[in-house]
Amino acid sequence: YLNRGASYLFLGDTLKAISDYNKAIKLDRFDPEGYVRRGRLYAAQKKYDLAMEDMDRAIELDTANTFAYFNRALMYYEQEKYPETMRDLNKVLEYEPGNALTLYNRGLIHAQLGAYEDALQDLDRVLNINPGNVLAYFNRASIFVELKQFQNAVEDYDKAIELYPDFAKAYMNRSYVKNLLGRNKEARKAYDIAQRKVAEYRAKNVTDAGSFADTTKKYSSLISLDAEFAKKDFNDELLQHRDIDIRLRSLYK
């Protein structure tokens, strides 16, 4: 039932998916996986009261279930309950200190709340774990700008562009920072490249030119692909669709 529910969800049939999840829970009320899956579906429908009930139940059944804590943190975030969000993310990191996905999200929330030094520490750890994480460089650069550490920001934008040469928003931001440093000729060059990248993107994506002209669409939900929660024995459905359901916070995009 859980697998068929996942298949229905993949096909966009949420009614049949929820029906199968309900059946799975009825058959085994002590398996947290059914509650987590149903709760995530409720959250996608913005039925947060029901979603929270399911996630609470999953955690009650398995107090070390980091995937449930992580998903509940996202639900708290959507409801702007930031202390509760941080509490659950911290709980994940108690069990899994090297969970890059959780560190990344916690770093972005620290930045949103103005705790820039804490944000830098989290993003530093993310990049130690996954040096190829484009958005971690991009967002850390934005934090450096807030701290007026402009040369550090330029270096992080350089790295983001090296990893993703079509990242127009990174070119644009780098142009802005170089202008602040008085490097006007370099700033103009970076700006011109950004405009060219945007034009190329629009030419290839005519129907979607307005919403993602900065070319960040490819990375809007990409963070690390090393399946931090795999050891919790959730099957491939949970991990495969994680990037869709997590909707990572790219606060400086």
Model-derived regions: residue spans:
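Alpha-helical tetratricopeptide repeat
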Residues: 1-253
